Each structure stands twice: as structure tokens, then as C-alpha cells.
Amino acid sequence: MRPAAAGVVLGVALAVGVPTAWAVTRPPAAAGAPVEQVLGTPAAPSAGAPAPALATPGVTVRDAAPTAAPEVVAPVRVAVPARGLDVPVEPVGTRPDGQMAIPDDVDRAGWYRFGPVPGAPGSAVVAGHVDDVEQGLGAMAALRATEPGDEVVVTDGAGTVTTWRVVSRESLPKQALPLDALFRRDGPPRLTLVTCGGPFLPEVGGYRDNVVVVAEPAS
């Protein structure tokens, strides 16, 4: 999947000040093998040069201990019962080259841990490979058959189950993915499921498009 923030092409770094866009690809496979490429996402926050110190305003504030950040419970399974999709999910970040570290196992998917969890404001992104020359068809291949209205069931690490409804399914050229929308961190909760689709391009060793399925809370 490749989000394109501010007109950025999949797999191409974005301008400073916007999250980096990058392609998620499988390791090289045998020539001509139908190995998928998956969506790219904004790069994880990186340590940069410290910001210049700001002048201290002349206002006395109440002394208080910082509020503890809420505990994040990661999703561990996503299912679309009507399409036979039932896939374990693990938290993933980025690889050293800036690509999303999608699980190599095509029967697993990755949740982008630098974005929201399902149910939090913004778009929670879960991506997986559509297939592999050695492993065959992946679990996320079933996304290509989803339809608006399909139920999506998400289970988190605490055993909490939430239900979602598919509102859209699109096959988008990787060079035209709306990265900012796919990876937004604010606004109503949304679940974004991504895999590869479209024709396989032997010259690049991957698929031309990304299948993007968007679901919203069922209640």
C-alpha cells in the first residue's frame, strides 16, 4: 500500500514536514514470479535535531505530575467472515530502508504501530501480502472480493472484539494513493485494510495497484 501524502508518489520520499511515503514490497523473488508489493505508509517518527529553546512565558502554572499516556492495546486478529478472511495481526514498524515491515508470512498481516489502533481517532492501517511465489495465495487476497456492507471483526490483545462495516473498496495505482487520508491520525475512527492488486508487472517484480478497503465502526 502506498500512501501519498501531499501528492507524493508511492515509494518516493515526501518533502520535509510531511510523513515519508514508501512502498511496502516483498523481498526479491524468482524472475517473473507473482510476488506482491504492498502499500507504503508514512515513515515512523525519527529523532532529529533538537528544536530551538523557546522563551519561557511569564505565567506561573500549577505543579503537577504528567498524566500517564493511555495504554495501547494492539489488534491481534482481523476477520471478514463473509469472504473467508481470518488473519492474525502483529505490530509492525519500518525497516532500515524506510519500508513498512510487513510480515513475510503471507498468512499474517501487520498493523502499522506508529498510527492509531482500531477505534482510536484516525485511520488504523493493517496490510498484508496478497501472495508469494513460494507460499502461494495470502490471507489478505480475500480483500479483493469484499463489498460495502461486509462485516469486519477486529480482536485486540485484551480479547476485546469490535465490529466494523466496509464502506468502500478501491483498486488504486500505487503512484496515486492518497497517503494523507490513508494514514491520518485524527478524525473519526476508520479501519484501512490494504494488499496488492491489479496486473502483475514482471519488470518491477510486483503488482501495479493496491486494493484499499475502508471500514467504519458498526455502531
Regions found by a protein language model. Give the residues of each.
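Solvent-exposed, non-transmembrane regions of membrane-associated and secreted proteins
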Residues: 17-148, 153-158, 168-219
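N-terminal export and membrane-targeting signals
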Residues: 1-14
